[in-house]
Amino acid sequence: MARLGNCSLTWAALIILLLPGSLEECGHISVSAPIVHLGDPITASCIIKQNCSHLDPEPQILWRLGAELQPGGRQQRLSDGTQESIITLPHLNHTQAFLSCCLNWGNSLQILDQVELRAGYPPAIPHNLSCLMNLTTSSLICQWEPGPETHLPTSFTLKSFKSRGNCQTQGDSILDCVPKDGQSHCCIPRKHLLLYQNMGIWVQAENALGTSMSPQLCLDPMDVVKLEPPMLRTMDPSPEAAPPQAGCLQLCWEPWQPGLHINQKCELRHKPQRGEASWALVGPLPLEALQYELCGLLPATAYTLQIRCIRWPLPGHWSDWSPSLELRTTERAPTVRLDTWWRQRQLDPRTVQLFWKPVPLEEDSGRIQGYVVSWRPSGQAGAILPLCNTTELSCTFHLPSEAQEVALVAYNSAGTSRPTPVVFSESRGPALTRLHAMARDPHSLWVGWEPPNPWPQGYVIEWGLGPPSASNSNKTWRMEQNGRATGFLLKENIRPFQLYEIIVTPLYQDTMGPSQHVYAYSQEMAPSHAPELHLKHIGKTWAQLEWVPEPPELGKSPLTHYTIFWTNAQNQSFSAILNASSRGFVLHGLEPASLYHIHLMAASQAGATNSTVLTLMTLTPEGSELHIILGLFGLLLLLTCLCGTAWLCCSPNRKNPLWPSVPDPAHSSLGSWVPTIMEEDAFQLPGLGTPPITKLTVLEEDEKKPVPWESHNSSETCGLPTLVQTYVLQGDPRAVSTQPQSQSGTSDQVLYGQLLGSPTSPGPGHYLRCDSTQPLLAGLTPSPKSYENLWFQASPLGTLVTPAPSQEDDCVFGPLLNFPLLQGIRVHGMEALGSF
């Protein structure tokens, strides 16, 4: 990389040398001020000389600040032929940058000239000027705070002069003291000082934007003397001197030699090494005293000590704290009260287990190194037999048969505590009653009782884990000195969810009462497990579940309720809350052939526990049931269709719009009146001739005219008669015509006969012949013949029925009676027509 950089620089220098006339000699930059306030505007101009013949006649001058091109340059040609570009930077926000005047040369910018711009602030006034006279170096050291950063090279100078007064009159000047770069302190040597005479001192700060001076300080160098701290050490023990008292330290120090001729005072500070205690200040120490006994300290405790001094009573400065000295105080005999309790073994009553607890009588009761249980035999003055020496809070020993009392003491290197007598007596006092216990929180138990009569002097309370973890060696006990107490809150060695045995014994003068015990849980636990679910019965949409409740557990809170949860395959959850006495539950509303996950939660006031998950699937519907359901559905659909059809058929206003009422001769009931072929010959009634034709109507065939019964404006159309008659074909109905019939749409006339009569009025019947152009049903039919009334052959009375006068002009009777070319009509009565 270094070689590559050197080659690049070499090529750049070579290219510049090869440029014609050297472009760098063509331009020159001038600025309004190279150093300005940060954020102030600055104006610069660049002039290109006329003798740069290798440039364009009108070169474009560009400006660049650092690496960024700056727009806004104003370019013009001067009278002497030179090109000038002027730019104004409104805000110079760079503390240091290069402004360049450039031209486009090829594909790159060629710098014609550049100038360095600086921006910053004028120096602030130096403050907190202070000076100290160091006797070790014999120099006056002054220091100050320079103020905020100026971003410009700033020089500081410590100036001073001598003065015989209060520095109002300036005397001889003292050589300026210039600190090193970056330092804010300076030393004036002793040769430039005049001791015991005032001098004026100040600091001057200067940079390119201005100058500032600190307030003047007037002082005597000896008034600002700072001494060096003395050397602190412990006092050597002397055979004649008494040993130091407990909690005391004997100290001495060696003063600083150059300051022996200066009057001074000192002070001491100390703190214990253990913990995070703060310094405690002791002083001032006695004048001209080089040793001191420091008391009131904790015994058998390590301390850290330091000392410092100051010129006194004249002005001066405190010295620094001396190096630390570590000392340990002496011990004191334990000052404690020992609360004792004892228990005899059942198998060996002379084996006694003694317990005790030290109770400090003072804030500093002394360190305890161990305990001694001793017995003084009667009749042996001064003889003490130790029974037990231990550092524990209990001891098991064999009690001599004649011993009824032992002594217990605590000891350390400084001595022993006051002996505590322990009297072994039988339980002859009254017992307390109604002992009870309850948990206050997971880490405490409240034990209460009713005191006996007379009041005891105190109580001994023991507690420890109950069965099956009971152990006499792990019991905790304490003594309650208040004989009128009715309860006590146990906080020591209490853990949650544990069964504890609590024993309370009343203490009397020279005796004690019988012990009473009670069991209690520090905190009841939630059920350890929930009952297991079992499937009893299951159907398509239901499932019957059952479970066996768990038996009550010691230390477990009683159940308050059950909650059963079931979840389907779509992860939809359902739940139901049941009483604690429930033994089963039926799930309803299940989906057939569906998978469900079910679990039971047993809850109490202490918490809840879930059972294992039971997975079941409901039954699938059988095939017969499915067929029944489909059959019922089909029957219902059929009934619906039938009802709809009947409704449409029975309602004329619904039927007529769907299809027209066009008669069908082939399926008409008229066809049943006359057989299709008559085997017998037609006979005529004797004595009767051809009935006269009373009226003939000729109908012309016209497709554009409506049928006669559909026309409402024809004068020939009238209402239907009260009695409908029949048409009779005159002639032999079996005769077959050999004449071909014209096709439909011709002008051939078809003759119709109309028989008019009335059942109520006797008289001869009337025939009505009509000419019709209506097309026949058959393609080719024989020509119409005369009509013969066959009614006379079937009439039992042999009389003719005459038509009603109002029916003589009727020729059209509706769509059911207008059938062309009927072979024969046999009237069997009016009842047949009534069915129409």
Curated annotation (Swiss-Prot):
Main location, first listed in the record: membrane
Example of a GO cellular component annotation carried by this entry: external side of plasma membrane
Keywords: Cell adhesion, Cell membrane, Disease variant, Disulfide bond, Glycoprotein, Immunoglobulin domain, Membrane, Receptor, Repeat, Secreted, Signal, Transmembrane, Transmembrane helix
Segments crossing the lipid bilayer: 628-650
Fibronectin type-III domain location: 125-230, 233-332, 334-430, 431-528, 530-623
PROSITE patterns named in the record: FN3, HEMATOPO_REC_L_F2
Sequence motif WSXWS motif, location on chain: 318-322
Record flagged with keyword Cell cycle: no
Extracellular-facing ranges: 25-627
Keyword Iron-sulfur attributed: no
Record localization: Cell membrane
Range of residues in the leader sequence: 1-24
Glycosylation sites (chain numbering): 51, 93, 128, 134, 389, 474, 579, 610
Gene Ontology BP annotations: amelogenesis; cell adhesion; cytokine-mediated signaling pathway; defense response; neutrophil chemotaxis; positive regulation of cell population proliferation; regulation of myeloid cell differentiation; signal transduction
Gene3D superfamilies tied to this protein: Immunoglobulins (2.60.40.10)
InterPro entries from the UniProt entry: FN3_dom, FN3_sf, Hematopoietin_rcpt_Gp130_CS, Ig-like_dom_sf, Ig-like_fold, IgC2-like_lig-bd, Type1_Cytokine_Rcpt_Type2
Domain writeup: The WSXWS motif appears to be necessary for proper protein folding and thereby efficient intracellular transport and cell-surface receptor binding.
Family membership: Belongs to the type I cytokine receptor family. Type 2 subfamily.
PANTHER family tied to this protein: INTERLEUKIN-27 RECEPTOR SUBUNIT ALPHA
Complexes and interactors: Homodimer. The dimeric receptor binds two CSF3 molecules. Interacts with CEACAM1; down-regulates the CSF3R-STAT3 pathway through recruitment of PTPN6 that dephosphorylates CSF3R.
Connected disease: Hereditary neutrophilia: A form of lifelong, persistent neutrophilia, a condition characterized by an increase in the number of neutrophils in the blood.
Designated name of the protein: Granulocyte colony-stimulating factor receptor
